Amino acid sequence: MDVNIAPLRAWDDFFPGSDRFARPDFRDISKWNNRVVSNLLYYQTNYLVVAAMMISVVGFLSPFNMILGGIVVVLVFTGFVWAAHNKDILRRLKKQYPTVFVMVVMLASYFLISMFGGVMVFVFGITFPLLLMFIHASLRLRNLKNKLENKIEGIGLKRTPMGIVLDALEQQEENISKFADYISKVNE
């Protein structure tokens, strides 16, 4: 299946007034995780643009360290995803605690980059955009269009780059099973 790029959402949809933002319910981790995954899928192009702008600024100031940091993060992430497919304990960590899994990848990348001396470039060029994405995805309430787009992505009718990354983190399967459960309840 072909990979489609999600449309760039309007600024007033991406960052509306404060009435469309709310603290997540920290007691219900699955609901919070669903909100984050839904927003990551829906606003993925906006997140990519914001991250590209920040990475460009930091990359312009320190190009070698930025390239080095990007290579290290990609290699560490790929290594952890590969290891998670081969080791049950890592697979469970990745599926049950995706945020912890990403934090472990980022910490491992941090320690590798610290050996080369590019820690500040790593923090501001790579980690800070990821943190901003996570904060926005956690706080932004979903709308009906967001939920509909995510159902289309979840049942496999549309493939996007963020959907592929979330598949690697095994976050899509949970949405598909919830959708299948919902359909079976409706049929009963």
From Swiss-Prot:
Subunit description: Homodimer. Heterodimer with ARL6IP1. Forms multimers. Interacts with ARL6. Interacts with prenylated RAB1A and RAB3A. Interacts with SLC1A1/EAAC1. Interacts with RTN2 (via first transmembrane domain). Does not interact with VAMP1, VAMP2 or VAMP3.
N-acetylmethionine found at: 1
Disulfide partners: none
Originating gene: ARL6IP5
Protein name: PRA1 family protein 3
Membrane-spanning intervals of the chain: 36-56, 57-77, 94-114, 115-135
Segments for region (Required for homodimer formation and heterodimer formation with ARL6IP1): 103-117
This protein's record includes keyword Endoplasmic reticulum: yes
Compartment(s) where it occurs, according to its Swiss-Prot or TrEMBL record: Endoplasmic reticulum membrane; Cell membrane; Cytoplasm; Cytoplasm, Cytoskeleton
Region ranges (Targeting to endoplasmic reticulum membrane): 136-188
Family: Belongs to the PRA1 family.
Species of origin: Sus scrofa
